[in-house]
Amino acid sequence: MRIEKDKELMNILKIMAPGTPLREGLENILRAKTGGLLILGDSDQILKLVDGGFKINSEYSPSYVYELAKMDGSIVLSSDLKKILCANAQLIPDSSIPTFETGTRHRTADRVAKQTGAIVIAISQRRNIITVYKGGIKYVLRDSSIILARANQALQTLEKYVAVLDRVVNNLNILEFKDIATLFDVLTAIQRSEMVMRIVSEIERYICELGNEGRLIDMQLSELIKSVEEDGILLIRDYCRSNMEYEDIYKQIQGLSSEELLNLDGLSKIIGYTGVPLVDTLISPRGYRMINKIPRIPSNVIENLVANFNQLKCVMEASYEQLDNVEGIGEARAKAIKNGLRRLREQIMLDKV
């Protein structure tokens, strides 16, 4: 449910991640210091900009691309990256398209990308860097060792943030079972959950850019976060005003800047509490998050429970007969819910000690 802000960039990075045939060809050109200009796409709009060159129309191969890059012109690849269409071609984009690039190769790449929306790759001969353009996007591909170092640093930061989130959530769990949770406790948990998810998004981009070299980072990330996002969403469902859509609230929180996220009063307004003291306002959870922790309770049953009892404390105080009357809950499931909540409470109180 995260907003996919960099979806297009992530798709580009997947195509040219280390281990892919395209990246291998680009690395070969980079090592040879010949420079190069490649355009990915075979639409009529792209082919109209191609002037001269040789029609190749052969299977794509990293070694072929490397050899063809020794010539001055650009290389045109099919959009599925399976064929090399032509080489040593000149690209003639609209010269009125604004560009802030310097150097003929990069100016051409930027203009072609803006005009056609295709992926254009410029490899600098002197600076020895690979720059990718698509529409208004410009991205410089970095060496895997640099990305790996940054990913490891981000993982270390994530570990610390997850540890803080765990402490905040464990404290909230205790307060929820005692029914003395304050708005401050709830907002702190929501805030910390979003902070963790922002670091996760950054690491996911590194993993995408690392390709097959990012497997270990991916495994470590999966181990660290587990159900952080799901719990964060359930927190919002537990405490937002009943007339508000939790999905819209979650999107709003994702759209906050780092400074805005630190402002708990601003977060309070987003979940529907305006002008109330955060520390003194007691609020009760609906129970989505806690009941979700009980094994083998379907989501539709949780919805029915919350609709019937409105608050977690009412679910806990309900008799077996009252639970049995809820649609989707029989005698066995009523016992499972009562026993599950009791065990959860005992476990949380033990963890406190």
Swiss-Prot record:
InterPro entries from the UniProt entry: DisA, DisA_sf, DNA_integrity_DisA_N_sf, DNA_integrity_scan_DisA_link, DNA_integrity_scan_DisA_N, DNA_integrity_scanning_protein, RuvA_2-like
Cofactor: Mg(2+)
Catalytically driven reaction(s): 2 ATP = 3',3'-c-di-AMP + 2 diphosphate
Key words, A-Z: ATP-binding, DNA damage, DNA repair, DNA-binding, Magnesium, Nucleotide-binding, Nucleotidyltransferase, Transferase
Enzyme Commission number(s) of this protein: 2.7.7.85
Protein family (similarity comment): Belongs to the DisA family.
Subunit structure: Homooctamer.
Name of the protein: DNA integrity scanning protein DisA
Organism of this sequence: Clostridium botulinum (strain 657 / Type Ba4)
